[in-house]
Amino acid sequence: MEYTVRAARITDIEALVALSGGSLGDGSSGPLGPADLMRQLVFLPHATVLVAERKRDILGGAVLAIRPSVRAGGYVGTIDLLVVDPAGEPDAVSASLIEECLRSAANKGCASVEAQQPDDPAEQKRWKRQGFVDDVPVLRHEVAPAGRRR
């Protein structure tokens, strides 16, 4: 059955958060919860929030965040969230969402796009079919927002 990938609207965010289940943070590291943060990202030029829908039902979604990188020689896009309804067509929907994220990243001048390594082997295969390759993980240090420091 046919579905459409389009830019998300703020009215889509609750459905996207519900579809995400426990994959989103609880908001404990910042003042905004996941839904509030995604609503802001809808309007920011350095982010792309997408949804896949069929007959007004959200089948999946993706968030692409863009940051500058001197090392990469331009901007780097990060697909920060990719969720699909397992009852739908997860392979086709995720492929369409990733493809649209890559198109958006190219249009915004990104030199590369990265994503977190999935734990699920089937999900890993989906990413590799889209041209993603294994890369060395990054070092990370959590920083408490200024209002939450003790």
Task: Map each language-model feature to its residues.
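Conserved beta-strand-loop-alpha-helix junction that forms the acyl-donor binding cleft
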Residues: 114-124, 142
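Active-site rim helix/loop that mediates acceptor-substrate recognition in acyltransferases
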Residues: 28-49
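A short, internal acetyl-CoA/4′-phosphopantetheine-binding micro-motif in the GNAT/acyltransferase core
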Residues: 81-90
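Conserved acetyl-CoA-binding loop-helix of GNAT-fold acetyltransferases
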Residues: 90-103, 129
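Conserved beta-strand in the GNAT
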Residues: 51, 57-66
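Helix-loop element at the rim of GNAT/NAT acetyltransferase active sites that forms part
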Residues: 18-31, 70
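Conserved N-terminal entry element of GNAT/NAT acetyltransferase domains
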Residues: 1-11, 146-150
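Conserved GNAT acetyl-CoA-binding A-motif
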Residues: 105-117
